[in-house]
């Protein structure tokens, strides 16, 4: 499998952008039934800009995993779309706090860890951790459904709920706003031995 970390315009294949939006549509619209912006089979929103950062995983069949990273110094989903998930807490407004959104995987296309979690989830967060350390990010936030929160805890990611810590209505599901602590516990969780082979995709080089 190939793992890419960066902006879509840096990806070695230009067609990956539409592949990403189709993959997201299959997961969030078709499979989960979320009320997302979908047009002609592509799921895309206002947070998808040329400067948005991504982690993508591909195999011989195409994309099988993704996550979007947004700086909290700019507009991001938690306060704009899901303010109730802040649970009374003030939204972070700093470039050293980033938001994770649009996490999606096709879990059956990779081996599973001993705890049953797909290796794709582990790989995505390994790359997120590397990105955060390289960018001087001290904290990550996200809005997640309750089942996804349980997956994160099973993986061993150090998370805590925001504000009053109670689940809220997110529309199609109930969920919570969470904070990730980028410490040695996070490093241990994403440093587990893996069965699959995951290689770095080469970035596009321009003159």
From Swiss-Prot:
Q: Which UniProt keywords apply?
A: Autoinducer synthesis, Quorum sensing, S-adenosyl-L-methionine, Transferase
The molecular function terms in GO held by this entry are:
N-acyl homoserine lactone synthase activity
Protein's UniProt keywords contain Cell inner membrane? no
- PROSITE patterns, sorted: AUTOINDUCER_SYNTH_1, AUTOINDUCER_SYNTH_2
Q: Does the keyword Ion transport apply?
A: no
The protein's role, per its UniProt record: Required for the synthesis of N-butanoyl-L-homoserine lactone (BHL), an autoinducer molecule which binds to AhyR.
Question: What protein name is recorded for this chain?
Answer: Acyl-homoserine-lactone synthase
């Amino acid at each position: 499998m190939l793992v890419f970390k960066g902006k879509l315009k840096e990806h070695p294949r230009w067609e990956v952008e539409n592949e990403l939006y189709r993959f997201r549509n299959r997961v969030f619209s078709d499979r989960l039934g979320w009320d997302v912006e979908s047009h002609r089979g592509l799921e895309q929103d206002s947070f998808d800009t040329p400067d948005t950062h991504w982690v993508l995983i591909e195999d011989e069949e195409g994309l099988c995993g993704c996550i979007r990273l947004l700086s909290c110094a700019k507009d991001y989903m938690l306060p704009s779309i899901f303010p109730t998930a802040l649970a009374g807490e003030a939204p972070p407004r700093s470039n050293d706090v980033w938001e994770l959104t649009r996490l999606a995987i096709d879990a059956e296309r990779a081996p599973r860890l001993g705890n049953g979690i797909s290796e794709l989830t582990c790989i995505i967060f390994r790359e997120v951790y590397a990105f955060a350390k390289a960018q001087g990010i001290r904290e990550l936030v996200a809005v997640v459904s309750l089942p996804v929160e349980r997956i994160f805890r099973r993986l061993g990611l150090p998370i805590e709920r925001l504000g009053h810590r109670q689940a809220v209505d997110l529309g199609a599901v109930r969920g919570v706003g969470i904070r990730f602590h980028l410490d040695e516990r996070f490093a241990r969780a994403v440093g587990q031995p893996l069965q699959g082979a995951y290689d770095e995709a080469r970035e596009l080089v321009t003159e």
